[in-house]
Curated annotation (Swiss-Prot):
Residue numbers spanned by region Required for interaction with PIWIL1: 68-72
Species of the source: Mus musculus (Mouse)
Keyword field: Cell cycle, Cell division, Chromatin regulator, Chromosome, Cytoplasm, DNA damage, DNA repair, Metal-binding, Mitosis, Nucleus, Phosphoprotein, Telomere, Transferase, Ubl conjugation, Ubl conjugation pathway, Zinc, Zinc-finger
Phosphoserine found at: 157
Residue ranges, compositional bias (Basic residues): 145-156
HAMAP family: RNF8
Protein's name according to its UniProt entry: E3 ubiquitin-protein ligase RNF8
Annotated signal sequence range: none
GO function terms (MF aspect): chromatin binding; histone binding; protein homodimerization activity; ubiquitin binding; ubiquitin protein ligase activity; ubiquitin protein ligase binding; ubiquitin-protein transferase activity; zinc ion binding
Role according to the record: E3 ubiquitin-protein ligase that plays a key role in DNA damage signaling via 2 distinct roles: by mediating the 'Lys-63'-linked ubiquitination of histones H2A and H2AX and promoting the recruitment of DNA repair proteins at double-strand breaks (DSBs) sites, and by catalyzing 'Lys-48'-linked ubiquitination to remove target proteins from DNA damage sites.
EC annotation from Swiss-Prot or TrEMBL: 2.3.2.27
């Protein structure tokens, strides 16, 4: 942890300061300095850079922004992050400021399936500067200045290899988190594959083939490394031919960029699964069908990527062997040592990338298990809702048939009329009955009065709206027929 700037310490020593205390840790606290805007993310231009050790893409490049409003109160805003910002267990809407108070709980990202809590959880506190200073995390500009000047620029004298370090080894060396924050562009690698045109949903049993391809590629690449090291004796080149391994490296990089972009899409699918879980009661079967279709599409795409990756590794090994034999036959030509160092470095970087992929397999498996589990829960909830709906409709039908039918026409009441004896009939039906007898068809009492029941009509109309289209159509036909007879 870096020490705070002495000038800032002098200015803040005499007063209290707001801070985000990381739960469960006595370090990496984030100071909220008055009058400044604090940005948090995994990018390079933020105030505090957070690199997740569990899931590199959990924190977005510019995840959230904290600043003071005109009244001087601190607010937090979700800067359209992928995995969200949570204030007191409630997810914040993007690009909207929310006031925070002392004791509030702030969570960045979501917990993985195997964990109960997220990796980055904080509590809003206000303490004296002296007690906060030892626990504060260094700002990103302090960390960058500490590492400034440690980078060296490599130079190559061979014209055929001038572009290889910039396009090959440096990109291959990037860890998964850095590649995800700045994706490799295939057009810059002179590759013919279009990785960005594929819409990836999620990973499924394709991880088995990923493991097999890594086991096959790793030993081959490592076995070629000692052979190249044996040729590293200092010789001078008089002429240089274009490296035959350059094309293979470029093709390999294109495939690796696709694999890394696949992980980015996996993080998006994890959030989609969480959203589906929250919207289960409002969801429809279309979401489930779409998710299953994406699973199948991604599985086929992943198998194709695995096959291409294995082919690239085999071609790369073959090319390296050819380069080794070529170097053995070269006499004292200028730049031979640079070429061999380049080949060794490329192999080492390839091996490091394979190790990174091997470490990230567990994250892929956790995400797949979480998605499958959420999909099953969504199906179960949908079945329960459908069963409840059918039960309500069945109960409604029984109620209509038993209580709300006219005894004369055996249909649901149309313009219900209640007699003095409390029995109800259709207005049309009782009028026709009274042409023959002026007594109740049920109890045989004389009809002295009749009252229209508007409440009963409205109740029947609303209940019929939830029934089948055949019942609604039949009722509409009866209403039209009776109105026509009444007018005639």
């Amino acid at each position: 942890m870096g020490e705070p700037d002495p000038l800032v310490s002098g200015q803040l020593a005499a007063r209290r300061s707001w801070c985000l205390r990381r739960l469960g840790m006595d370090c990496e606290w984030l100071q909220l300095e008055a009058g400044t805007e604090v940005t948090i993310g995994r990018g390079l231009s933020v105030t505090y850079q957070l690199i997740s050790k569990v899931c590199p893409l959990m924190i977005s490049r510019s995840h959230c922004v904290l600043k003071q409003n005109p009244e001087g109160q601190w607010t937090i805003m979700d800067n359209k992050s992928l995995n969200g910002v949570w204030l007191n267990r409630e997810r914040l809407a993007p690009l909207q400021g929310y006031c925070i108070r002392k004791g509030d709980h702030i969570q960045l990202g979501v917990p993985l399936e195997s964990r109960e809590t997220a990796e980055y959880e904080y509590e809003v506190i206000e303490e004296d500067w002296e007690s906060l200073a030892p626990c504060l995390a260094p700002k990103n500009d302090q960390r960058m200045e500490k590492h400034k000047g440690s980078r060296t620029k490599r130079k190559f004298s061979s014209p055929g290899l001038e572009n290889l370090p910039a396009e090959g080894s440096s990109d291959l060396r990037c860890p998964l988190a850095n590649v995800a924050s700045k994706p490799i562009e295939p057009e810059k690698l002179h590759g013919k594959g279009d990785a960005s045109s594929q819409s990836l949903g999620c990973l499924c049993p394709g991880l088995t083939s990923l493991k097999a391809s890594e086991r096959a590629a790793g030993p081959h690449a490592c076995s070629a490394l000692p052979k190249v090291l044996e040729l590293s004796c200092p010789k001078k080149q008089k002429a240089c031919r274009p490296s035959a391994s350059q094309n293979s490296l470029e093709l390999f990089k294109v495939t690796m960029s696709r694999m890394l972009k696949l992980k980015t899409q996996m993080q998006e699918k994890q959030i989609a699964v969480l959203n589906v879980k929250r919207q289960t009661r409002k969801g429809s079967s279309k979401k489930i069908v779409r998710m299953e279709k994406e699973l199948r599409n991604l599985q086929s795409q992943l198998y194709a990527e695995q096959a291409q990756q294995q082919a690239r590794v085999e071609q790369l090994e073959k090319t390296f062997q050819e380069e080794a034999h070529y170097l053995q036959g070269l006499e004292k030509e200028q730049g031979e040592c640079d070429l061999k160092q380049q080949l060794v470095q490329a192999l080492q970087e390839h091996q490091a990338l394979m190790e990174e992929l091997n470490c990230s397999k567990k994250d892929f498996e956790k995400i797949i298990q979480a998605k499958n589990k959420e999909l099953e829960q969504t199906k179960e909830e949908k079945d329960k809702v459908q069963a409840q709906k059918e039960e309500v409709l069945s109960h409604m039908n029984d109620l209509l048939e038993n209580e709300l039918q006219c005894i004369i026409c055996s249909e649901y009441f149309i313009e219900a009329v209640t007699l003095n004896c409390a029995h109800s009939f259709c207005s049309f039906c009782i009028n026709e009955w009274m042409k023959r007898k002026v007594e109740c068809p049920i109890c045989r009492k004389d009809i002295e009065s009749r009252t229209n029941s508007l409440v009963l009509d409205n109740c029947i109309s609303k209940m019929v709206d939830n029934l089948s289209s055949d019942v609604k159509e039949r009722r509409s036909v009866l209403i039209r027929e009776r109105r026509a007879k009444r007018l005639s």
